[in-house]
Amino acid sequence: LNERSTASTEAVRRWFDLAVRELRASADILDAINVFPVADSDTGANLVTTVGTAAQAVQVLETPDVGELISLAGQAALDDARGNSGSLFAVWLCAVGASLEGRGLTADAFAQALSSGEVRSWSALTDPVPGTMLSVIRDIAAVQVPEAEEPGSKRTLLHHMERVVAAAREAVLGSTEELGALQGSGRVDAGALGMLIILDALRRTAAGEGSGRPVLWAGAPEDSAEPTGQETGVQVQQLLDRMREAAAACAAEGTDLLSGPAETGVEVVATVELTALEAASVRFELTEIGRSVITSPISQIEGELWRWRVHVHVDDRQAALDVLCAHGTPRNVAVTGLDPEGSGRQSRVNPSDLD
């Protein structure tokens, strides 16, 4: 390993650690404002769990390739993803990592990776809805790399990340009007806000803010651009503070921050071995009986056979399990209640019980 590779992969580990800490610190806010696709108050918990899985994975994975490390972290996160937000983040992370494999993390490479993340995330959902985490993913992919700067430099990467986080923040603010359930509330989408927290953690890691440890970039060693993200960080924190104050005020009054659409039933997530054709069939059949269907490949097994992660909201958990069992043997199955009384109550399904 050369020194730069070691520094960069170490910085990836720092990014996930920081993201988990920041998500955990804001989990109560994310849970309180969670309204889409169902107001089950678990966005914060789901993101902490999913990103936490990625953070644990990178601590034991060994590779000098930043992209491969991110890709493998994404696969681990996707295999254990929770909720709509956790599943979409993991799908996005897999695509970003795959795009960066064999490349240094420059502004151009990062921009291309964000485009890959947009394509895969939007295609993973049967019915993508703007005004959510998807809008953040869409808008950051549209950010142009600064033209009047040296290609491949640390300064260009940092400035590009500044723009990416700024675009993410605008997308979060725009969710108030873009997502029907939020219109007129003055609140923002929880998944979108969670994605902003993760992206700002990446920006801070890349800039080495508050740390003398390695920064995440692939420029020349002599390129010592100073971090320029203090204002961006303040704006992100101000938005979090605003949501926290709103949640606290409602809690003091004994009222709900948002009254989201009532929904009963359960969330079913599972991993199953499928070909692309079988995955398409599973997606169609789950769409017929459920909502919020997400399907995305995790990793190739051999030939046309891949491991797929599947997410769906259904009224009858057995109906979803029957669809999966008709095409393969579901593994790592988790079922979580969506109704107000059952929300957050998760049960694991033993594969032997499905035979």
Model-derived features with residue positions:
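N-terminal loops that bind phosphate or other acidic moieties
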Residues: 1-355
